[in-house]
């Protein structure tokens, strides 16, 4: 049998192409799944684990157990693993055991899980959200451990298909509600841990299960404990307020009226109070006689109904008057009326307390207005590109102040987070060349400006207007003052707030370039009408006072303000080179000036700004929206961080739209100083790679810069390939390695593992 030349060539080609994949032992599907798991866990320090490729079975990756070529077990308990889990867990072909317990994994439990799983242990982590309903599809599941997390909501009613489940641990979460009825279908269940939750209702659902261990401590269960549960060998119920009084005993048997001879004993009868004969005998059990009646007992009697017939009630045989037992149609017993009085008193007190609480709440709301409606959450900034347009000549006439509607989120005072791929205007380079040199603005702005129609008033930072809860040190730069501008003067400087002078726009407000006489420039932020409506004059002045205290070399300086005719504006120093985002992604001429040393100095300047906010200010000031568009560059490429102290004015935005800067915990409403550190790490990644933090034009898996870069930071070959090509290799390898290490520590998924900002500043200073 002979082969033609092309057949031999084809066979060798196929062999060469398949050799890299056939060399490994592990199923390629499992390799891809564990690579994705490694990435979502934040690239932890696990022996042999890789983000791409590898042979988990052949190389015996840490915690991995295989059967032939398939991964069947992954056990990494107590390895200090962070990050989160994703739906790619379902890609494992035949995995049976996943033990990720006692780590720092956060986020929600993924909806997609491998159908072959038998033992799933996620206990002692930081999972949040609800228990996913898709667990009902795991018919082979025998052990499920979700204890010691932050899971909330009710336990879903989906246990019908989990007939093989023998252990269920839901302890130490924030679960509430009743036990689902399908939990009674768990015929194989032996161990059930529900302690330390907020579960309510009764335990009747599980009374027929053959349990050996049951722990319901520290819950809110009520009702009697079913007798079958009391027979469980290991039954713990301390701290749960079981209330056996809500279940009434069996009703007493109906007793026929005794014969007449039994009514004759000499028992003192209680005459009717109103002279009406007692109600006829009703088939109720008589009251038991009191053995030791107290002297002169009070007589509690209910007024009999006028339609009561004749007959004698049963009385106590002890000679002491007792309460008459009336039929349901009567007026009720004395005990009944006593209970009503108690209920009436308690209800009255409760109503008084509720009304008082409502009054206090309304009073406090009137004081604070709606300030607390705003919190700084995640938000997506889609802002125009910042570019320096040629100065416009002021118009000879003055028009009314423009009232722009609220627009897309604002970023920096120029150069916001625009839609990626936004073209740089052709005249941008010409405009930049037309800008004044570094000394574009002198510090004599605090003196009255000649164009002002009214003499400027000095606003001292120790004002007494609206002393709100400020997040700034009260004594910092207490002598600072700001120039009070008039609307007329700012109209003149900004060409009547013309669109040509807009250098940024967003939800806080539009930013205009203001040209003063003698070629000086300012940046004027005109707060949106939405902010003006929700902020009083006193609150605005307090904001100005607080921002004035944030005066350091790397914080964008507030120079003045305007508060006239319902309009509020903040006047900042002007940075002619725009933002770092412009320099990296839009301005090619400026990009060429970003040498390695310049980039390290920019990272150091940004870090020092955050160090001032986090560690000098008491209490600390969290920026909450730190990104490359907030890092402005002056004429010497020195850093000025914008929007410091304005976080509370930002409306809530979905964290999924934060363009790759948001730390994982921000998704759940937690924003701390360490969240700023994570955002700084992303900015340093931009400096290292020249890539955008999020780019939809790239392949899936490469779109989010942090997710793509983290696994490569400790691989020297991959690290050199990811450096910005415009540097042309002009950087020391030792400096590159140190910078990558700083970035890697800043991008830890767990906030507690990220270094304090002072440590980052110190490490960057050692690189200079």
UniProtKB/Swiss-Prot annotation:
Tree of life domain: Eukaryota
SUPFAM superfamilies cross-referenced by the UniProt entry: L domain-like, Protein kinase-like (PK-like)
Effect of inactivating the gene: Alterated pistil morphogenesis, such as twisting of the gynoecium. Double mutants sub/scm poq and qky sub/scm have a stronger pistil twisting than single mutants. The triple mutant qky sub/scm poq has a dramatic pistil twisting phenotype due to defects of valve cell growth anisotropy.
LRR repeats: 94-115, 116-139, 140-162, 164-186, 188-210, 211-231
Biological-process GO terms, alphabetical: cell morphogenesis; floral organ development; leaf development; leaf vascular tissue pattern formation; plant ovule development; plasmodesmata-mediated intercellular transport; positive regulation of atrichoblast fate specification; positive regulation of trichoblast fate specification
Annotated positions binding ATP: 503-511, 525
Protein name according to UniProt: Protein STRUBBELIG
Organism the protein comes from: Arabidopsis thaliana
Gene: SUB
């Amino acid at each position: 049998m002979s082969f033609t030349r092309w057949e031999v060539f084809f066979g060798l080609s196929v062999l060469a192409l398949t050799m890299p994949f056939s060399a490994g032992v592990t199923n390629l599907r499992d390799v891809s799944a564990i690579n994705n798991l490694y990435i979502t866990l934040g690239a932890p320090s696990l022996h042999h684990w890789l983000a791409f490729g590898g042979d988990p079975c052949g190389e015996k990756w840490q915690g991995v157990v295989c059967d032939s070529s398939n991964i069947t077990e992954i056990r990494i308990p107590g390895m200090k693993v962070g990050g989160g889990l994703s739906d790619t867990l379902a890609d494992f072909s035949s995995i049976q055991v996943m033990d990720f317990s006692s780590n720092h994994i956060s986020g929600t439990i993924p909806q997609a899980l491998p159908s072959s799983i038998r033992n799933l242990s996620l206990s002692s982590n930081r999972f949040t959200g609800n228990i996913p309903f898709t667990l009902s599809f795991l018919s082979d599941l025998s052990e499920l451990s979700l204890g010691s997390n932050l899971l909330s909501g009710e336990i879903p009613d989906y246990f019908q298909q989990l007939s093989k489940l023998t252990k269920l641990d839901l302890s130490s979460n924030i679960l509430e509600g009743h036990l689902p009825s399908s939990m009674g279908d768990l015929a194989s269940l032996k161990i059930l841990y529900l302690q330390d939750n907020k579960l309510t209702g009764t335990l009747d659902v599980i009374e027929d299960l053959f349990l050996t261990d049951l722990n319901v401590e520290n819950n809110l269960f009520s009702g009697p404990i079913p007798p079958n549960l009391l027979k469980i060998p290991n039954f713990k119920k301390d701290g749960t307020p079981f209330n056996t009084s809500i279940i009434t005993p069996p009703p007493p048997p109906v007793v026929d009226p005794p014969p007449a001879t039994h009514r004759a004993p000499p028992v003192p009868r209680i005459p009717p109070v109103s002279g009406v004969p007692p109600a006829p005998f009703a088939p109720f059990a008589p009251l038991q006689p009191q053995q030791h009646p107290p002297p002169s007992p009070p007589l509690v009697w209910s007024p009999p109904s006028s339609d009561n017939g004749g007959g004698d009630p049963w009385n106590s045989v002890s000679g002491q008057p007792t309460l008459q037992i009336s039929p349901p149609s009567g007026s009720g017993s004395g005990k009944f009326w006593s209970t009503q009085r108690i209920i009436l008193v308690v209800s009255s007190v409760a109503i008084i307390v509720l009304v008082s609480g409502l009054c206090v709440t309304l009073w406090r709301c009137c004081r604070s207005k709606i300030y607390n409606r705003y919190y700084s959450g995640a938000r997506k900034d889609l802002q125009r590109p910042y570019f320096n347009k040629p100065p416009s000549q002021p118009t000879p006439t003055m028009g009314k102040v423009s009232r722009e509607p609220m627009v897309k989120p604002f970023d920096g005072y120029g150069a916001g987070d625009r839609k990626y791929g936004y073209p740089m205007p052709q005249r941008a380079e010409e405009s930049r060349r037309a800008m004044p040199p570094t000394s574009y603005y002198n510090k004599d702005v605090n003196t009255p400006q000649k164009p002002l129609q009214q003499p400027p008033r000095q606003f001292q930072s120790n004002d007494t207007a609206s002393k709100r809860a400020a997040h700034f040190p009260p004594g910092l730069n207490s002598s600072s003052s700001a120039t009070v501008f008039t609307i007329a003067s700012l109209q003149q400087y900004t060409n009547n707030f013309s669109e040509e002078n807009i250098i940024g726009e967003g939800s806080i407000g539009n930013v205009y370039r203001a040209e003063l006489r003698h070629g000086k420039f300012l940046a004027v932020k005109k707060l949106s009408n939405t902010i003006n409506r929700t902020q009083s004059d006193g609150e605005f002045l307090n904001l100005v006072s607080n921002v004035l205290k944030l005066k350091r070399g790397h914080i964008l300086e507030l120079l003045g303000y305007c508060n006239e005719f319902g309009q509020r504006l903040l006047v900042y120093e002007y940075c002619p080179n725009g933002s770092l985002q412009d320099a990296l992604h839009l301005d090619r001429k400026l990009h060429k000036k970003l040498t390695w040393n310049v980039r390290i100095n920019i990272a150091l300047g940004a870090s020092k700004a955050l160090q001032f906010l986090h560690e000098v200010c008491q209490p600390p000031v969290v920026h909450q929206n730190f990104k490359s568009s907030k890092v402005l560059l002056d004429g010497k490429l020195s850093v000025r961080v914008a929007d410091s102290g304005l976080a509370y004015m930002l409306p809530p935005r979905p964290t999924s739209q934060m363009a790759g800067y948001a730390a994982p915990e921000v998704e759940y409403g937690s924003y701390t100083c360490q969240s700023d550190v994570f955002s700084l790490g992303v900015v340093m990644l931009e400096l290292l790679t020249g890539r955008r933090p999020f780019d939809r034009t790239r392949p899936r898996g490469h779109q989010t810069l942090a997710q793509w870069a983290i696994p490569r930071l400790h691989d020297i070959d991959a690290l050199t390939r990811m450096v910005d090509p415009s540097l042309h290799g002009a950087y020391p390898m030792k400096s590159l390695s140190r910078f990558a290490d700083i970035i890697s520590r800043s991008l830890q998924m767990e906030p507690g593992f990220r270094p304090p900002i002072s440590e980052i500043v110190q490490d960057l200073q050692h690189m200079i």
